[in-house]
Amino acid sequence: MKRVLWITPSILPSSGGQAMHSLGYIRALSKVCELKVIARATLGELKQVESDSSMFQGLDVTLVRAYKFNSKFNKVRQPISKWISHNSGVMVPYRNIANTIKNVVKNFEPDIVVIDYIGMYNYYTLTKKMCPHARFVYVSHNVEFKNFTDIKTSAEKKSFASNFWIEKRKKYEERMLCESDASLCISNSDIDIFKAEFPTTKKLVFAKPLIKFAKIKSKEDLRKFGKKLLVVGSMDWYPNVNGIEWFVEDVFIPLAKSDPEYKLYLVGRKPDDRIKKLGEKCENIIVTGSVDSVDPYYKECDVSIIPVFEGTGAKIKVLESLGKGIPTVCSDFAAKDYLLNNGEMMVVPQNAKAFESAINKLKSSLETRMAIYDKMEQYMENYYEINPEIVKLFE
């Protein structure tokens, strides 16, 4: 079996979509190779793992704090490091993590090194020197430079500084894609962008999310329709903020005016000011902020709404809605990587009438809700087969 070292910024599911995607592949690939994982972790995450020893059961995972001691120097360094990482998209190298990598490489001698996420670029350059004969695989979670460009363009007029950081990110991404022996890309659309932007990229392989979600809704739950709509996601991520704002203004507020019994739950961490204002504007909108578990909301609500029309990467909330068993109205943009061709959810364009019509159909037709539930179950039964091209890379 090949010896594989996987270096990642986080694999705790609570950290978000990137971590969940990574953990899905780590679990799958640990069956075909000897896999060691080095993951950065905060003190809170280390305590979380201590309290739940089953979290990484069967996996060889080393969690490392970026800072070993809470010294005065580190208290000064931390905000500076965060500022640099925020702008460059690349984590400042920490001695504690670097030393852990050196020790593992020395004893393990990996055949393959996986650099998970562009933020680990500095650890790529370090490991490349230490493992000159190893093959390198890069895991791309988004087209980072494009997302960053979109954020800067929407937030402000491009300044010299913002242009500098955009180009910096683009160079990091180009090096990772062009120098790695293969890259795993979460979206086919991302692959198309990379090929057009960086013609010398090597092997780009589609790596659909393998995250497993526990089913929350039963078929019996669908018999009642309480007019409760749900949007789940990071409430500070610009595609979510823009999409939710459009949905509320163009679809939900008119819907709630015609039928005041409708409620919309916006569930997710770090709600942007624009999201908070939506809750203040309409009393039928509940902005929860961060919650311990989204499961009670999936259980209680009738329809999941995914109003995303921009951004790169896979939209993991599509898979989450399918896995949780909730009837869903989803933009065709968000659904494009999932091949939903058999009525597994209501896939619609960015059109207010289309969204409203889909919601009304789910409200008025128990038969439609039941049929969608059955189609979701069938889809999920066949979904989790890993791409054979990926298996070949690690055998």
Describe the predicted segments one by one.
Residues 1-62:
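N-terminal subdomain of nucleotide-sugar transferases
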Residues 345-353, 360-366:
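Conserved acidic donor-binding segment of nucleotide-sugar-dependent glycosyltransferases
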